[in-house]
Amino acid sequence: LKKKRKIYDLVILCLGRESEHYKKIFKGKSIKKDYNEVAITCHIKHNLKINAASQYFYEEGPLAILPFKNSFFSLVWSVSNNFFEKNNLNIRSIIEKKLKTILKTTSKIKISNVKSFPIYLRLSKKYHKQNCLILGEGLHTIHPIAGQGFNLILRDIKKLKELIKKNIDLGLNIKNSFVLKNFYNSRNAENTIFGVGVDITNSFFKKNKHFDRTKFALLDNIVKYKNFKKITKYISDKGFF
C-alpha cells in the first residue's frame, strides 16, 4: 500500500533543544552563548515547611529551590564544567550537605531523579517556516538562574492559543494565515529581552573579588524598597507585554 501524504493546517515541533529537524527546516540564525556550565537538577522529599521559591548564591554557582507540592521541591544548581567533572560521583552527598546547611536541619531528606545538562543561551531569530512552528526549548534556551525558561514557554503557548482561537472564531483558516507571523511579532521581543536580561543577571552574580562588596551593598539597598519584590514577581509571572 502506498503511504498517503498527510496535509496539516499547522505543524508544531516540540522536540527538545537539540533536534536535527530544526536545522533541516529552519536555517535562520540565532543568538548563542556557551556558559561552560552544567545544570544539576533533582527532586527533594522532605518534612519541612517550604512554600516559596528561593535562590542561593554560592561560589560554585547559584542554587534554586522550587516547591511544586507538599513535602517536595525541585532543585536546580548551576556549576562550572570543571566543578561537575571533579565532583560528579559525589554530587548527591554534596547536595545533601548544602541543603542541610541552607534549611538548617538535621532531618533526613530524600534526593531522587538527579539529572544534569549543559547550560547555554540560544535565542532563535526564526520561529516558523510556512505552516511549521518551533515551540519550547527549541525556540529559546536560557540560563536557569532566574527560573524563567519554563515561564517563557507557557507564555508562548498562551499567546499561540489566543491567536488560533481568534482565527477560528472569525471563521478563518489557520494555514496560510497570519497566525504564525503574529505569534513571532508578539513573542520575539519579550523572549529576547528575557534571554539577554537573564544572561546579564548571571554575569552580575558571578564571583568577582573587585566588585562583590559594591554588588552586595547595592542589593541590600534595593531589597529595602517594598515595591521591588512586587514588580519583579509580576514580571516573572506575567512578562513585559
Model-derived features: positions:
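Conserved FAD-binding catalytic core of PHBH/FMO-like flavoproteins
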Residues: 4, 11-105, 111-114
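C-terminal helical "tail/cap" subdomain of flavin- and related membrane-associated enzymes
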Residues: 162-241
